[in-house]
Curated annotation (Swiss-Prot):
Similarity comment text for this entry: Belongs to the KAE1 / TsaD family.
Source organism: Bacteroides fragilis (strain ATCC 25285 / DSM 2151 / CCUG 4856 / JCM 11019 / LMG 10263 / NCTC 9343 / Onslow / VPI 2553 / EN-2)
Cofactor: binding comment: Binds 1 Fe(2+) ion per subunit.
Keywords: Acyltransferase, Cytoplasm, Iron, Metal-binding, Transferase, tRNA processing
Protein name as annotated: tRNA N6-adenosine threonylcarbamoyltransferase
Lineage, broadest ranks: Bacteria, Pseudomonadati, Bacteroidota, Bacteroidia, Bacteroidales
CDD domains: ASKHA_NBD_TsaD_bac (cd24133)
Cofactor entry: Fe(2+)
Length: 339
């Protein structure tokens, strides 16, 4: 008998539903919210309301594209956190009601675990090469920057993480200072492709171990811009490509430096990247360069699996279903939770 999992993701501003059957993805529907662009960031109340409007049609569309009826579902997996509490509650509440009405198990999924296990999403007709355990995963997004030792689907250890800002958060804030709009990551990525990554130098942290820090870079970028604009008020407009390229290169250097140390320290050559910032062209190129230079076997997700999506929640739910790792109706949402 087939195992069919419906995954639901609503941790921030993307409403998503996906269906996985026996480990293979049948559908992955994502509804993004453009309303936040005018505010320069996600407005939690608006995000929650949009999730309420979107969740039913998104789930309906996911089932339709998968060619699956709700009665065929084996379980419903949902994101329990971390994320915006209001947004999470929409997905958690819907998942509970939906599963309860069908009398099928509920599976709570850690959003961060989902990003890591996105590398195990399989699609019909594709190579679907997957990492072998143990492997390292650089999880980097607007809210997280972590180096994770992945020993099994259900056994992960954080080796290092940011002690202040996340990499994506720093990029977004620097983009905002430049007046480039929201979200800043894709804009910086686009401009950086046309700029000189060695045009400007910004400070890098000097902290021991495998932890990250990006607050110093953010401050260095801000103060440098302030000084340059005293001499040329239009400095940003005249040099935005080089600024973006230099900022991106600095962030990538910081990320890869600690990742190299982790790979050497733990003697692991299978290395993956996950999270929203893994869509960044500069970071992807750095991974390919490191693969060639250090003999790494690298795993870079499809662009559709870098940002928040329910496919990663569904595949994690699929693995937990094999272990009968279900949750109760009392399972709460958590705005803050680690791996």
């Amino acid at each position: 008998m087939s195992t069919i999992i419906l995954g639901i993701e609503s941790s921030c501003d993307d409403t998503s539903a996906a269906v996985i059957k026996d480990g293979y993805l049948l559908s992955n529907v994502v509804s993004s919210q453009a309303v936040h662009e005018a505010y320069g960031g996600v407005v939690p109340e608006l995000a929650s309301r949009a999730h309420q409007q979107n969740i039913v049609p998104v789930v309906h569309e996911a089932l339709k594209r998968a060619g699956v009826t709700k009665e065929e579902l084996s379980a419903v997996a949902f994101t329990r956190g971390p994320g915006l509490m209001g947004s999470l509650l929409v997905g958690v509440s819907f998942a509970k009601g939906f599963a309860r009405s069908l009398n099928i198990p509920m599976i709570d999924v850690n959003h961060l675990t989902g990003h890591v296990l996105a590398h195990f999403i399989k699609e019909e007709g594709e190579a679907n090469e997957q990492p072998d355990f143990p492997f390292l995963c650089l999880l980097v997004s607007g809210g997280n920057s972590q180096i994770i030792l992945v020993k099994a689907y259900n056994d992960m250890e954080i080796l290092g993480q940011t002690i202040d800002d996340a990499a994506g958060e720093a990029i977004d804030k620097c983009s905002k200072v430049m007046g480039l709009g929201y979200p800043g990551g894709p804009i910086i990525d686009r401009l950086a492709r046309q700029g000189n990554p060695k045009a400007y130098t910004f400070s890098k942290p000097h902290i021991s171990g495998l932890d990250y820090s990006f607050s110093g870079l953010k401050t260095s970028f801000l103060y440098s811009l302030r000084d340059w604009m005293k001499e040329d008020p239009d400095f940003i407009e005249h040099h935005k490509n080089d600024l973006a390229a230099s900022l991106e290169a600095t962030v990538v250097d910081i990320l890869m430096d600690k990742l190299r140390k982790a790979a050497k320290q733990y003697k692991i050559n299978e290395v993956a990247v996950a999270g929203g910032v893994s869509a960044n062209n500069g970071l992807r190129n750095a991974f390919r360069e490191h693969a060639e230079k250090y003999g790494w076997k690298i795993f870079i997700p499809k662009f559709s699996y870098t940002t928040d999506n329910a496919a990663m929640i569904a595949i994690t739910g699929y693995f937990k279903y094999q272990d009968k790792d279900f949750c109760s109706i009392e399972q709460p949402a958590y705005s803050r939770v680690t791996l």
